[in-house]
């Protein structure tokens, strides 16, 4: 989903979609899409709204730009532009016409997803995997091994649980990289009502 307003990133997100804010020399959304591709995902569905066309445009082919770079002999830059999206990956967009939250955004993609397995990626959080296997790749492997849905979480300070979706677990909190059964997600609970300090990433 890329339809949110990015209120935690204002004022920058007032005119630039938060997913397009740069991390070094590339927008955040590119890192997310490339991790999905490395995990074996070839069909990317962006759930967006009318103010986010810059995201759709970013993954579209820019024939005029490519022609100009080629004509000027800027081959290295042309290769980078073309590398934005591998040729065997498809990106499509569906619109979320009303801001009704993450669950609604995911449901907007249901007609396209059908009964196929899918991953929901939130492109506003960066996670350092510490040089190990990327988290999405590990989650895809676990899904195929166990046949059970996976959700990535990160421990947050108690004072900040009211800013995130917080998970309730069945049993103890697992060690990093391990899985545990989950019973619910509570959206932005009051500190005293939070079932844990594990936030959905």
Q: What function would you assign to each model-found segment?
A:
Residues 57, 64-68, 75-171, 175:
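Conserved beta-loop-beta/alpha segment of the NTase-like Rossmann-fold superfamily
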Residues 170-200:
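A short, charged helix-loop
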Residues 12-13, 120, 161-162, 197-198:
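Short glycine/proline-enriched turns and hinge-like loops at secondary-structure junctions
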Residues 5, 97, 154, 186-189:
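Short, well-ordered turn and helix-capping elements at secondary-structure junctions
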Residues 1-77, 91, 96, 132-138:
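N-terminal glycine-rich phosphate-binding loop and ensuing alpha1 helix
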Residues 28-31, 104-108, 184:
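Well-ordered alpha-helical segments embedded in enzymatic catalytic cores
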Residues 22, 93-95, 151, 184-187:
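Structural signal for conserved beta-strand scaffold positions within catalytic alpha/beta enzyme cores
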Residues 9-10, 128-130, 194-195:
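A generic structural signal for short coil/turn motifs at secondary-structure boundaries
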